[in-house]
């Protein structure tokens, strides 16, 4: 169980695959997708709900992630902990994760156990039972998770502060795991109310992948998910960001930091919102600007100037409401962070002024495609890409058309995207520095 931080690297590669899925809907509104993959006698079930941390009420940060934990605590027919014990007993694996726009649950098991995992997951869609006896101890588990993963990690603390600075009004600015003071106040009643409000078949997508058939999946989906009644689910109405007129800067010093690092994160359009014409060029821009040892930033700052140990760029366009574009660099031991920042700013300005060669753009597109082809072989790649698309405003058709749209990107479009997004007033610069022990 985990809160999910969107990774530009994970989903940039995953979404490029073509999975040839087949889909249908049940009468209660549940969308079902089947991705046949007969390479091994394995089946995977993923259930994606269109609800995440950005759908929480003010003062209840962390509730979506907390509820994810609580779905393993028993139903009217399954005792606390029995869900995962059953999956383990049949030789399978299960887990779940939460992000700003979704909560997802998955199991992987032998293909002949598909009915077992579908029966278990369908049961907790509508039969969850929560009492203080299980909720309050699990709240302590989440509090400890926050302490260990965020409060004891300087890098995680910095990321949290960056998001708070980047989003002036939108709930993407609060942590998925929640603020410590608000987690402490979450109750059994909060969790049950959130569950009843958002966990419904008409607010979910079921994805089955592996050594399965559409006919069998349809039969099992009708048997176990079909009887669950639909509910009225609230519209996802969220506050918008005001115009960003001033660059922001976050500096964190900590005795546990060994080497300094510098990064800058820009607010950007996403696949679902904003200037969507820029999203595919932004994927290519991230690759050509900072996607590896042949990229411009690495070549200029690490190889030619020799002042950095690493440098790169990334794009995360998966948000329902906003995306992000980032650049980063770390100095060599003993290097000066201000010198590094000046060099990065110079290289970004030079890239926008000079543009990119068509050969560089073509190489970047080929690298993205090669990564995508490799990612497609995994059984989880398709469910990840399609599930995330469903919860964040895209369609199966968008996922399937991804390689073609990347291939069509031109150098002119990449430059237009760079000029539109790499605006310092819409950015947060973050610096992580060592601090001498007192």
Residue ranges of model-derived segments:
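Bacterial N-terminal signal peptides
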Residues: 1-13
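Short, solvent-exposed loop/turn segments at the edges of secondary structure
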Residues: 3-4, 40-42, 100-102, 157, ...
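Short solvent-exposed loop/turn micro-motifs enriched in small/polar/acidic residues
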Residues: 15-18, 243-245
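N- or domain-start disorder-to-order transition segments that initiate the globular core
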Residues: 16-41
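Short, acidic/polar N-cap/turn motifs at the starts of alpha helices
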Residues: 20-21, 132, 249
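Charge-rich, well-structured scaffold segments of protease-associated domains
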Residues: 25, 82-234, 304-305, 309-438
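Active/ligand-binding-proximal structured segments within catalytic/core domains
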Residues: 29, 38-87, 264, 275-289, ...
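His/Glu-based metal-binding/catalytic segments typifying zinc-dependent metallopeptidases
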Residues: 147, 164, 233-294
